[in-house]
């Protein structure tokens, strides 16, 4: 059950990837830290 929780998080991240692309352009490389 605990392992299923992070799964939905990854799904949200996939959708956020499009926004992340814009964030990277803004210089949000620090997000990796």
From Swiss-Prot:
EC number: 4.6.1.-
GO CC entries: extracellular region
Residues given in the record as Mg(2+) binding sites: 32
Cofactor note: Binds 1 Mg(2+) ion per subunit.
Tissue: Expressed by the venom gland.
Listed InterPro entries: PLC-like_Pdiesterase_TIM-brl
Protein name: Dermonecrotic toxin LiSicTox-alphaI-1
